[in-house]
Structure formats: C-alpha cells, structure tokens
Amino acid sequence: MTWVLDGELEHKDSEGNAGIIYPGLAQRMSAGTGIWHSEMNLQKDKDVHFIQMWVPPDTERINPSYEQLDINRDLEKGGLTPIASGRGHEAAISIKQRGAVLWGGRLKPAESVQIPDAPYVHV
C-alpha cells in the first residue's frame, strides 16, 4: 500500500500498470508470484512524502495485481475512512488479508477519533 502525503510518485510495473500517485489517492500493488516495479518522484525540485505499508497475504501463490482509489472525498468528511481492507469494507481497496483493515484520515483541528474494534490493532 502506498499513500502519498505530499508531492507525487510515478508508478510503473512489469504487468503494464502505470500512473501518478498523489495525495488522496491510495494505491495497492500485490507482488504475488512476482512483479518488478519502480516509483519515482516526479518533481525534481520538491520532496515527496509518503507512507508505504507491506501487508502479507493470507493466501499463497496469488497473481500480481494493482489497484488505486481516490479517497479525497472520504477524507474530507473527517474521521477515519477504510483505505484498504480484506474484510469487505465499502470504498476500500481490496487486499488479500482477511484480518486487516488499514484506516486513515485527515483530522480537523481538535477532532478526535475512536479506533474501530478489530481482532488486531496497530497504530
């Protein structure tokens, strides 16, 4: 999972997927049985800041895959929104890990949130 906070990343991979990852766009690439990829900062005069998370699948020998989703509208509502899920949450990118939900948000000043109940919680 890649989530850009500031700047832009260009993604290319051996499956023919290519695109620009920008703030508010969540991207998932599953290596599966094998994939090559590159991610490059598009702006030479500006740093890019991003979060990248590896979530091991709960199934072996899956095919490589790629998905991206613009979540800006959900983030503007405040609170937390599911960015990626193996549990079928609406609007989330699908991941091959039934026990995982990755939440994110753009909190407003003084806004607080409650972490949703889950079998495993990492903050």
Across the structure, where does each feature detected by a protein language model lie?
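Jelly-roll (double-stranded beta-helix
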Residues: 2-123
